[in-house]
Amino acid sequence: NPLEPAHIHIRNAESEAKFWLEPEIFLARNDGFNSKELREIFSIIESNQTQFKETWYDYFG
């Protein structure tokens, strides 16, 4: 949704989460991921935050 701040959705067969990318990475919603999975996801987002934000702004303007 371009009306919201930059964010990323993470999904698998049974779970879904949404993370805000700015002003800092923040878990907005979690439905099904356990705490270990969320830490792993957070780490991946943190390592790729710049690329995710650039892609988001390229897509939504």
Stretches found by the model and what they are:
Residues N1-S35:
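A short, structured beta-strand/loop element
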Residues G32-G61:
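C-terminal structural segments of small proteins and small subunits
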